[in-house]
């Protein structure tokens, strides 16, 4: 008889989010088309705390109130997930119907949704008192004043409407990772100057961001990823930055790398391949040339996978 649940063999202890799942007994995957009764029976038999579901039917969740970690594909009615008071992490591609109410998850720490439906209730997470990691696609605001979660340490966001980072300064004492992608209207980055604990910043597809003056004002940055950020005029504003260790970038208008010579803690770069750079890109330590076990690569991975 084919089991309804199988353990996920791809978890890696060096990835913090995976490590949490492993410490909870591993993540169990609901096989496509599995009988809901069998899912419940096997989950109870294995004391499952972390579940990954790809199917639409979530009705069986009501019988598994001990779940702490839930990952969903493109689900149907999200309602049964409300019956999980011990939930600490929630990840979903999206769902067809129903609303979430994150106040029913008082222990929630991680939340990430790829394609939330309109009216799906994701706003109930914005001020959640225990959320530390927040990933939002299709964020509807023009600024970040709605996001007030007091323990926020990592924010990953894409939004066709975001124009300003106003409101981000409310997280100056906690936020360490900020990743912005698909933000074509974003122009105002002035709030970065207040982010004294921010160590990782990624910006991509922000056509309105052409200067790094406001980026350079975030003086605690260790990793700056402009890997898909075209149209930046110059890396010049980064010169003299006291803490940058890794810089990833596309071509700039002035094609000058002189500022990288003036980064006292620089360990590696990842740059757009071109012979037009001055000085030559090959004169800088290239991230891809370091072996996986090298400290430079390991420390980079730790920053990228902080949470």
Can you say where each PLM-predicted feature lies in the sequence?
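Concave beta-strand-loop units of leucine-rich repeat
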Residues: 3-62, 66-79, 86-210, 214-233, ...
């Amino acid at each position: 008889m084919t089991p309804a649940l199988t353990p996920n063999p791809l978890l890696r202890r060096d990835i913090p989010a995976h490590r949490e799942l492993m410490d909870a007994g591993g993540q169990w995957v609901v096989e496509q088309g599995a009988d809901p009764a069998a899912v419940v029976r096997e989950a109870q038999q294995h004391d499952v705390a972390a579940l990954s579901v790809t199917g639409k039917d979530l009705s069986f969740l009501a019988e598994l109130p001990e779940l702490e970690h839930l990952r969903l594909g493109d689900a149907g009615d999200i309602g049964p997930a409300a019956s999980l008071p011990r939930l600490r992490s929630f990840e979903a591609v999206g769902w067809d119907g129903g609303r979430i109410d994150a106040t029913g998850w008082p222990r929630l720490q991680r939340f990430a949704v790829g394609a939330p439906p309109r009216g799906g209730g994701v706003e109930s997470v914005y001020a959640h008192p225990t959320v530390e990691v927040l990933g939002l696609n299709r964020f509807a605001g023009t600024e970040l004043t709605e996001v007030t979660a007091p323990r926020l340490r990592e924010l990953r966001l894409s939004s066709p409407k975001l124009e300003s980072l106003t409101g981000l300064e409310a997280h100056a004492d906690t936020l360490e990772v900020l990743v912005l992608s698909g933000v074509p209207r974003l122009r105002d980055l002035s709030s970065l100057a207040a982010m004294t604990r921010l160590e990782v910043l990624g910006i991509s597809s922000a056509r309105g961001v052409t200067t790094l003056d406001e980026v350079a004002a975030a003086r605690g940055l260790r990793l700056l990823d402009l890997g898909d950020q075209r149209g930046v005029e110059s890396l010049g504003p980064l010169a003299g930055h006291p803490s940058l260790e890794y810089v990833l970038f596309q071509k700039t208008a002035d094609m000058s790398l002189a500022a990288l010579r003036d980064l006292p803690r620089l360990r590696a770069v990842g740059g757009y391949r071109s012979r037009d750079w001055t000085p030559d890109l090959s004169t800088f330590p290239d991230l891809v040339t370091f072996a996986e076990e090298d400290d430079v690569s390991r420390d980079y991975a730790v920053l990228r996978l902080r949470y």
